[in-house]
Amino acid sequence: MFFMKKIRDKTFTYLLIILISINYLFSQSKIMEYDKSLLTYDFSDPNPIPILSKNPKIYPYFTFDGYDLNSEQKKFKIIELENDYVQVFVMPEVGGKVWGAIEKSTGNEFIYRNEVVKYRNISMRGPWTSGGIEFNFGLIGHHPSTATPVDYVIQENEDGSVSCIVGNIDLPSRTQWRVKINLPKDYAGFFTEAVWYNPTPLHQSYYNWMTAAAPAANDLEFFTPGNAYLEHSGKSNNWPINEGGKNLSKYNQNNFGPSKSYHVVGEFNDFFGGYYKNSGYGYGHWGNYEDIPGQKLWLWSQSRSGGIWEDLLTDTDGQYIEFQAGRLFVQYLPSGDVNPISNVSFEPNSIDIWQESWFPVKEIGGISDASQYGAIYIIRDEDSTTLNLNPFINFNGKIQILLDDKKYLEENVNLQPMDVYKMKFKINEGINFRVKINDLKIDYETINKKLIKRSFSSHTLKIKETNQSLFNSAIQDISYRDFDKAKEKLKKIIEEDPYHTDAISYLGEIHYRNGEYKKAIDIIYSGLSIDTYNPSLNYIAGIIYKEIGDYINSKESLGWASRSIKYRSNALSKIAEISLIEKDYEAAISYSNKSLEYNSNNISSLEVLAISNRLLSNKEDHQKILTKIESIDPIHHILSFEKFLIDPSEINKTKFINSHRSELRNETFLELSIRYFNLDQTKEAQMILMKGPRHLTNDLWISYISNNKDKLDDLVKSNSINFIFPFRRETIKVLEWAKNNISNWKVDYLLALNLWSKGRHDESRKLFKELSDIPENENFYLSRASLMEGSNVASYNDDIKKAY
């Protein structure tokens, strides 16, 4: 209003400036970090037996087998983000989850916050606690870090927003995930920006679902656009009215049968949510359809079988439902159903970035349409229509009602976030009209024109095994980390059709993954003798030659691979890495920049650029690259380490060490070290490990890098094997080196585990058998018994007896 008046008084002008400045100051979002005591039913009893026989897909993680029946107060780190409209709470020590979120004008939770931390045996590793938003990456299930600390940083941004970035490595795939929880200064809701990248040269499993919780209540109605829902198998069913006439979009009509998973599909839309009809508030999620098409509802059974989980997971907060957003249509579990749904792979050296919004609604009756900037609900009567609006931002603009795409009504409104605006107009029920609110990116039409033409059923297909169907099945196995199954299927295909170059390429990749480089190059060479220009075969050949140090043939093969747009950025990045290894830093920079032309966020290329510029003393360019990496991944440990290398002060050393905050810090130190080692930066690789926690695998790497054999025997003798789970293909050569230099059963045992994890079961069994009854450690015998079970009953029984 001040700006509409002519200002003549200087004093008043100064006062106006002060008032605006104060208003600007108070409109900033704020972020706080503090410890909070919460009633906790804790978990304990980590299991030292490798998970390889139980769930090899998540090795090297281990399970927790103890769960408290009684609670105690326990302190947790809380990151609180707040502006004038909402409060958001993050728990970096509990998987980085959003603990809950509150709409301040009503005090209602639009993200369910469980006031107790009640761990129960639900996740892949066991402990899981309900509520908030859980970030799941990697493989179907509650991710392995869901109950343990992850890395995090907090930021106060120039635009007045605040952010908490959480993230971790998914160890089996070695992919890196980050989620930025961002709260703008004048926004009724918050954003999450996910960054997930695959820094490996291999295909990895691809799974992402953001699992949010909301209170369960009989008046809850789900606004989830679509005309079908899919089961985990991909089987299609009717939505929202099922075959029995139940309206599944109403919580109270789900009072039948077991717990439910509804993956709702069929409509090209960007939002879904829920509304409590009697309480007058609700929650919602927004994300571009091309980024986050998956929308799932999880409902506990309303019988006692579901009700017991209210007692098991909460004390006084009541039952909850989950509304989940995913990168795919379905949380897919392979079964006998024939349909178009499948698992997919994460392409080598690729990165995915997407944004989502989580918001409250109040006093509007439901959600007919929503964007990241506002939500509307339409109420139709016989002779009139009511439009209810919640903006999430300051909104000074037009609401347009169109009939036959011609303006019927237009209103100018000036609203603040979470204002409730209602307009009633004369359009009879049954007449189609359109609502356009351009400034809020809302465009809604009462006749649904957003149903998609996509089949979710394959009833017309006859199940017939062909080489192509078997190949598709093998690719599914790779995406589901069933590498042994995939290998056998690919071998069968190649036996029947030696010209199936796709099968040859993937089989070579599996052998590379397993550290079997001779087998890998032999199979790939057979394919290249059929098709010398094949980009996939050349790419796999290139990474194999690079691994065995044949850089000429690696660069030659990668050059051909780079002609394909699929491999261009990745292949050029690998050539840049070889140039760095060969100490041709200018070439490393040149190839990295070429790689970035085709993927500007290629983390591997940016890493090579940072290291090369530092080695050339290009301080300004070095800093620019670190700034670029930080803009993509503020948690990346290379940032603090490279800064330490430039300025090796005590403060920078502490910053580097403290940047590793996750549960398994030894693994994040080792992952960074191996990255430098693979680039022939051996001094830096050793330095990283020396500054990290003491751990047998890491210490063996230190000895290997420095070729220090003198204290190797003492090192191994003085360390326990408990919770030492080597899994990287690079560590195989370290353990083989140690085995060749000392005689100690622990090295053989660790090598056997590493080989088993890579599908090299015969080699692993041989090592286990050769150890006979030499080890004096009960966990060795339990581990051998669990892995060798079924191969020899007498040996299994003997191992169990020795353990106990």
Question: Can you describe what each PLM-predicted range is?
Answer:
Residues 32-42, 79, 97-100, 108, ...:
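A contiguous, surface-exposed recognition patch within enzymatic or periplasmic domains that forms
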Residues 48-74, 78-82, 130-188, 309-344, ...:
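Extended, loop-rich substrate-binding clefts of extracytoplasmic carbohydrate-active enzymes
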Residues 81-82, 88-107, 166-217, 356:
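Acidic, contiguous internal or C-terminal segments within carbohydrate-active enzymes
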Residues 367-465, 637-639, 700-721, 727:
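Long, contiguous interaction/recruitment modules in multidomain scaffold/adaptor proteins
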Residues 450-471, 656-665, 735-743:
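TPR-adjacent "capping" and linker segments in tetratricopeptide-repeat scaffold/adaptor proteins
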Residues 468, 502, 536, 570, ...:
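Start-of-helix register in tetratricopeptide repeats
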Residues 506, 540, 574, 608, ...:
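Canonical tetratricopeptide repeat
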Residues 520-526, 555-560, 587-594, 619-631, ...:
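Alpha-helical repeat scaffolds
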